[in-house]
Amino acid sequence: MLVLTRKLKEAIQIGDDIEVVVLAIDGDQVKLGIRAPKHIDVHRKEIYLAIQAENNAASLASITSLQQLSDQLKKGGKYDER
């Protein structure tokens, strides 16, 4: 992990497209501004992890539903979504 020290209004450049600026420091909180292209998602870590968990749960539900549908079709029956 690269560790950098920055003062108020100083920035860090990541590649050609991403800039992180220290906007404010208040006690133990630091407010950061992030400039990044629109195609790059920027989230707080806890939000990112929640999104990943939801996506994983949704993909598992889809796999289960598809397997149930496949099993029913193999038996010649109709699929019941209940």
Curated annotation (Swiss-Prot):
Entries under InterPro entries matching the protein: CsrA, CsrA_sf
Pfam families, per database record: CsrA
Localization in the cell: Cytoplasm
GO annotations of cellular component type: cytosol
S-S pairs: none
Taxonomy, superkingdom: Bacteria
Any GO molecular function: mRNA 5'-UTR binding
Record-level GO BP terms: bacterial-type flagellum organization; mRNA catabolic process; negative regulation of translational initiation; regulation of bacterial-type flagellum assembly; regulation of carbohydrate metabolic process
Record keywords: Bacterial flagellum biogenesis, Cytoplasm, Repressor, RNA-binding, Translation regulation
Entry keyword Repressor: yes
SUPFAM superfamilies: CsrA-like
Main location as per UniProt: cytoplasm
Coiled coil regions, renumbered to chain: none
HAMAP family hit by this protein: CsrA (MF_00167)
Homology family: Belongs to the CsrA/RsmA family.
Functional description taken from the UniProt entry: A translational regulator that binds mRNA to regulate translation initiation and/or mRNA stability. Usually binds in the 5'-UTR at or near the Shine-Dalgarno sequence preventing ribosome-binding, thus repressing translation. Its main target seems to be the major flagellin gene, while its function is anatagonized by FliW.
Subunit structure comment from the entry: Homodimer; the beta-strands of each monomer intercalate to form a hydrophobic core, while the alpha-helices form wings that extend away from the core.
Name assigned to this protein: Translational regulator CsrA
Gene source species: Anoxybacillus flavithermus (strain DSM 21510 / WK1)
